[in-house]
Amino acid sequence: ASDVYKRQCMYNTKIAPLLPYGIRGFLWYQGEGNSGQPELYKQLQPTMITDWRIRFEQGYLPFLLVQLPNISGGSCQYFREAQAESLQLPNVGMAVSIDVGDPYDIHPNNKKPVGERLYLRAKEMVYKDSVGVFQGPVYDSFRIEGNKIRMKFKSTGSGLMSKDGKDLRTFEVAGEDGKYVPAKAVIEGNDVLVW
């Protein structure tokens, strides 16, 4: 069967039967099936969100998505970036799972933190119940400072810190040739300085 046919079947069997009912929002835990097509996903995800909102006729229903966890040897970083672009739509939230995944298994066993993050985000977005910090740091912007890049983050709670308290060691930079190499990175307040 073609991909279009499969998508139509999924919609017709899983979503269309729910249209007559009132709902409070969507939780979307994307599998890795599309992870090899991040550029296409940048179009598909926002289109799906917009389409479902139109069909349910309830305005900007909250849409909460789970960003793919870390997996070694893949290109999921580009897909995670594509997923994050959906945050540009109104009333869309994201639960980051990169820190709770298993680098050798795209289907991590520990899903409790992901559920807790979705719960806190839903409490804030859907029920307007302020819960304080409900997510980890979110990239905001960057600026070039000589031969270094200063990355700014928001939603930093009590400040940026590494998970294990050690120096940051998973950053990479690329030159004009497009080849990535390991980079040094340090935390400065709510910023990360990379070179």
Annotated model-derived regions:
Residues 21-25, 58-64, 88-94:
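Loop/turn elements at helix/coil->beta-strand transitions in domains of secreted/extracellular proteins
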